[in-house]
Swiss-Prot record:
Any one GO BP annotation for this protein: ATP synthesis coupled electron transport
Entry annotated with the keyword DNA-binding: no
Keywords, in A-Z order: Cell inner membrane, Cell membrane, Membrane, NAD, Plasmid, Quinone, Translocase, Transmembrane, Transmembrane helix, Transport, Ubiquinone
Protein name: NADH-quinone oxidoreductase subunit N 2
Self-association and partners: NDH-1 is composed of 14 different subunits. Subunits NuoA, H, J, K, L, M, N constitute the membrane sector of the complex.
Pfam families per record: Proton_antipo_M (PF00361)
Tagged with keyword Membrane: yes
Single GO MF annotation: NADH:ubiquinone reductase (non-electrogenic) activity
Catalytic activity as recorded in UniProt: a quinone + NADH + 5 H(+)(in) = a quinol + NAD(+) + 4 H(+)(out)
Gene: nuoN2
Family: Belongs to the complex I subunit 2 family.
Amino acid sequence: MTAAALLQWALASVPEIIVVTGACVLLIVGELVRKGRDDLLLWASVAIVLLAAVATLMLAGEMRPAYAGMFISDRFAVFFKLVFYLATILTFFLSRKYAEIEGIGRSEYYVLLLFALVGMMIMASAIDLLSIYVGLELMVLCTYVLTGFLRKERRSNEAALKYVILGAVSTAIFLYGVSLIYGLTGTTQLDRMAEAVSGGPLDPALLLAVVFIVAGLVFKIGAVPFHMWVPDVYEGAPTTITAFMSVAPKAAGFAVILRVFLNPLVEASNAWIIVAAIAVATMALGSFVALVQDNFKRLLAYSSIAHAGFAIFGVVAGGQDGIASVMLYLLIYTFMNLGIFGAVIMMRNGDFSGEVIEDYAGFAKFHPGLALLMLLYLFSLAGIPPTAGFFAKFYVLVALVERGFVALAVIAVLLSVVSAYFYIRIVMVIYMREPERAFEPALTPLVSATLAFTAAGTIGIGLFPAWFLRLAQQSAFGG
């Protein structure tokens, strides 16, 4: 191996190297920082992510394969990495006051988030099943620990334990599928797997391998029938980690799914039939079960399941438009979901948690401006025009109709109507109920900035959806 080749590999992975190096340095520096200087850890973490973002943008102009065909830096990976950076920085901002209240603002909290970010970055650039596994495990190992970070709370420990056990099972299923693929094709690289379907019928064992890989991946995005961990983990984890897990790891899971599912091997296996069934079941379960939830975080967990189902419809559509619709959906979902979680986090003040929907009764009478922001996020999540959430769903539906999946588009619309009810129910509690007590949100400058930024993103994409769709199309394969 020549020095020039090593240099090319290093250049392709500069953003990952920056975050790993920064996280290691932060881990050491964190032990030297005096208690009460958490701001230093926060801004150092933000600086690391921003530096990685600059490096990523510098790589956006060309395609750089690396590590013997296991890793690539292309526009598709750049798009997803920018979504990860956005979600991570906003999570840092939301964590400042919340971490202080909960007593979790130690350096390892930020370091684990950074290493989870590295795992997601690897997943976005991975073009080999083994490198996908490495990124996947780095991400989930960090989120396992972060889920149980409230060590004195039983539900946090319970959530972490459930997540670890079910996550280990899903990983084993995924690895079994990978081993079958390697045994039957002699490779784990996605592009070389296509050679297995050239000429002749598809081996039934390959179909089984595809099913195992599909099962392992849909667990990571919380899709049916591997959704059972989502409600308990989202409810038990620290709210900032719940917010992070609801957007960033989900986007990373979809990045892998788009790379894997649109491979000729998977397309030849007619796996889209399985994926379509998963999409319908996921959206239906998330929408109907959310109707009876009283806990805000648990409701948002089922909301997350329903949104995952809708995004999977874009995977079923396939093609460049289908890919672009999923990418745009995930970008918009990052803004509106972090926004609504930011509203929940700002309610955490003293002995008031804001995790029960009834806690928001009459909120508009005390804080009309903040209530208006919550209204914006909830309407966007429901897909009500002219918010960004409407266009996220609209472009997925367009991709479905253009590919001839009209029945699936109709099902998606009907289930969206069902899901709109539980969002409007929260709006009614905020605006039409009498307040039970007076409360003051923990509205720090960083939380305020996060709410303002996510609101601007939700409104901005709603006003100029075509521009962001073109960005997603240019970032999609072959764009």
